[in-house]
Each structure stands twice: as C-alpha cells, then as structure tokens.
Curated annotation (Swiss-Prot):
GO terms for molecular function: magnesium ion binding; orotate phosphoribosyltransferase activity. HAMAP family: PyrE. Pathway: Pyrimidine metabolism; UMP biosynthesis via de novo pathway; UMP from orotate: step 1/2. Its cofactor is Mg(2+). Catalyzes the transfer of a ribosyl phosphate group from 5-phosphoribose 1-diphosphate to orotate, leading to the formation of orotidine monophosphate (OMP). The keyword Glycosyltransferase applies. Orotate binds at residue 125. GO terms for biological process: 'de novo' UMP biosynthetic process; pyrimidine nucleobase biosynthetic process. NCBIfam families: pyrE. This is Orotate phosphoribosyltransferase.
Length: 212
C-alpha cells in the first residue's frame, strides 16, 4: 500500500487545502477549514496509479464477491475505470439523476440481478451523493456489495447515514490519518492542528461558532 506517498503528494500538489481563517462551504452547507479536491488527482499519472493500485487491493480484500465496479459521477468515474481495468471487471457508472433525453437512463453499463456491485466515489463527506447512487442502483435491480472511496472525513453524519442505509463502506485514506501526517510533517502549526481536530469532532458546531 502507498498510503504515506499518496498523502504526501496530495499535500505537495495542494490537492488538500487548509484555511482555518477563511473556511470553505461544502455542498451540504457545512463550513470547513479543509478542502479536498480529489478531482485533481487524474492530472498526476504516478499518483492516480498508486490510488488505483491501492483501491484495487482494498476492494479485492474487502469485497471479494465483487463482479462489477461502479463509478459515481463525476469524480468517481475515472478511478472506477482504472480499478475495473486492474481487476479486469466490468464497469458501470451512476449519474446524480436520469438523463432528460434519449433513453433517460441514470445508470450506464450493463449488470444483472446476480451481480455484486462495488461503487467508487472520490470523497465521502456526509455520504449523501454516493448513497443516492446506491439507491438508484438498487432501484434498477442491482445489488450493491458496498462503497469504496479514496478519502473520507469520517464525520459523524457519514457514519450515521451509512449505518441507517445498512451499506458497508471502506475508504483508502481517512481524515485522522491525514491529520496525523500533516502534524508530524510540520505542514501545520499546533494551533491549526487544534482547529482541525475540533472541527472534526463536531463540524456543525464549529461552523456555528465561527459565524458567531
């Protein structure tokens, strides 16, 4: 596994940005002192190859029953394609909503009711987008074995949402691992470390306090 190298390159290439004084706003409305733009990883051949290799090994270990790899549009699609190639498995991808033209499909690619599908997304914050993809796949008759991602913040909301949906998810990298690496490498100050740790414990409370 290449966890340390991947995290180091994510930091080096500023794919992960830390800004405690000017926090970012996520799609959920959550304020955060950190932003992870994993869409940029496709621009770095060595990085994307390490990610694909480690994700493939992770899926083979955690979901040995997998017969199809699914990409969650849009950021999960390139990584799903690379993993499907390495595992020599068929691939599908899932849109956020059905097309409004043509055949009106939400899922592209073929699968049967006997297939075991593993969906890949780049990042899990609250889990909303990938769990919508799970619902869409199951609505079309697919069986979702679980979800894999490059990175997760391991936020309480995500844990609760996956538990409620009864969906297994396995990340390659997690926020606690990133925070530990950032702290050890000296890329962040002790004050920044404390801010990032406090945010992780209760993101909504942190955002509310920041705005007060």
């Amino acid at each position: 596994m290449h966890k340390d190298q991947i995290i180091s390159q994510l930091i080096k290439e500023k794919i992960i940005t830390i800004s405690p004084d000017k926090p970012f706003t996520y799609a959920s409305g959550m304020l955060s002192p950190i932003y992870t733009d994993l869409r940029l990883t496709v621009s770095y051949p060595d990085l994307r190859d390490m990610i694909a290799s480690d994700l493939s090994n992770l899926i083979a270990a955690e979901f040995p029953q997998a017969t199809i790899i699914g990409g969650v549009a849009t950021a999960g699609i390139p990584h799903a394609a690379l993993v499907a190639e390495k595992l020599h498995l068929p691939m599908i991808y899932v849109r956020p909503k059905p097309k409004d033209h043509g055949k009106g499909r939400q899922i592209e690619g073929r699968f049967s009711e006997n297939d075991q599908i593993v969906l890949i997304d780049d990042l899990i914050t609250t889990g909303g987008s990938v769990l919508n993809a799970v619902k869409a796949t199951e609505k079309d008759g697919g069986k979702v074995a679980g979800v894999a991602s490059i990175f997760t913040y391991y936020l309480p909301d995500a844990k609760e949402n996956f538990k409620e949906a009864n969906v297994k998810y396995t990340p390659l990298l997690s926020y606690p691992e990133l925070l530990k690496k950032e702290n050890e490498s000296g890329h962040i100050t002790s004050d920044q470390y404390d801010i990032l740790k406090t945010w992780h414990e209760d993101p909504w409370a942190w955002g509310k306090k920041f705005n007060s």
